[in-house]
Swiss-Prot record:
Binding site for [4Fe-4S] cluster: C270, C273, C305, E312
Keywords tagged on the record: 4Fe-4S, Iron, Iron-sulfur, Isoprene biosynthesis, Metal-binding, Oxidoreductase
Catalytic activity: (2E)-4-hydroxy-3-methylbut-2-enyl diphosphate + oxidized [flavodoxin] + H2O + 2 H(+) = 2-C-methyl-D-erythritol 2,4-cyclic diphosphate + reduced [flavodoxin]
PANTHER family: 4-HYDROXY-3-METHYLBUT-2-EN-1-YL DIPHOSPHATE SYNTHASE (PTHR30454), 4-HYDROXY-3-METHYLBUT-2-EN-1-YL DIPHOSPHATE SYNTHASE (FERREDOXIN), CHLOROPLASTIC (PTHR30454:SF0)
This protein's name: 4-hydroxy-3-methylbut-2-en-1-yl diphosphate synthase (flavodoxin)
Cofactor binding note: Binds 1 [4Fe-4S] cluster.
Class of enzymatic activity (EC top level): oxidoreductase
Protein's organism: Azotobacter vinelandii (strain DJ / ATCC BAA-1303)
Single biological process term from Gene Ontology: terpenoid biosynthetic process
Protein EC: 1.17.7.3
Amino acid sequence: MHSESPIQRRPSRKIWVGPVAVGGDAPISVQSMTNTDTHDVEATVAQIRRLEAAGADIVRVSVPDMDAAEAFGRIKQQVQLPLVADIHFDYQIALRVAELGVDCLRINPGNIGREDRVRAVVDAARDRGIPIRIGVNAGSLEKDLQKKYGEPTPQALVESALRHVEHLDRLDFQNFKVSVKASDVFMAVAAYRLLAGQIEQPLHLGITEAGGLRSGTVKSAVGLGMLLAEGIGDTIRVSLAADPVEEIKVGFDILKSLHLRSRGINFIACPSCSRQNFDVVKTMNELETRLEDLLVPLDVAVIGCVVNGPGEAKEAHVGLTGGTPNNLVYIDGKPAQKLGNENLVDELERLIRRKAAEKAAADASLIVRS
């Protein structure tokens, strides 16, 4: 039942993506990006709603052409989450989505074109209070930086980012955040570390093109975890070649593991061995599936035997430890109920939901009293 994180976050300027604060003292937000065809309004709206149900704070949508910009406007009218428009090359697309109510523009000033075009986009953003994300990627560095460094390096990523930052500074625009992404964990981490001490704007963290569900989760957890543990990062996106909903789940799991943000159940479970008194793996799989809808922060321990079971169970809001002839459930650190293996998951789910309801009511009462 640990709730406080020892991490001291890097001070940063606060900006607003719609109603979601990013930077400053705001919670670290979790975002994803749609992988539907933006022209398909129905499919894109459906995916955004699934992301919202999974807990996404912000969603990015690719807007490759003017037809997609018009579709973006229709999408924006049908969803509640703040939307970031991902735009490259054509500044007129940025101007159009600004008119249609976009919450944030993801651009690189360097690929928008002439100074007057960049100024037009910045003026549109300034007039409407729209923040900009400068998104630098190792796979699309400027040609002169590729020539200078020979290959993508942390220094090249940061030089590119600072070039864009200076561009916005010249236009007296400070309402922006920055990312310096690479698919290599060490490169991305080094770039963010270099950049963190040179600007005061919020940092959007990500390991780009991290891979599939398993490999991408591991890379993102390692890379983002290193930075977050150092206090670097104000919003995160886990990039996976998978259902975008999985990105949200992994993002929250990373934050939960560092006690930076709590949402839903934090499971503690043993890997199981021959000492287990019930099927730990099956129990865990069923509980994770059944309890996905719970948003109340709750620690749940599922331990198969008495070696570590009582100790772990006592530290959780709800803890199950295997035993003979019966398993023992702890609630808030105290023995509460014995359960046999028959209907074990059903009974455990009932107890967890009851505890979640009690905790939600208690938390609401604290908010009202304060």
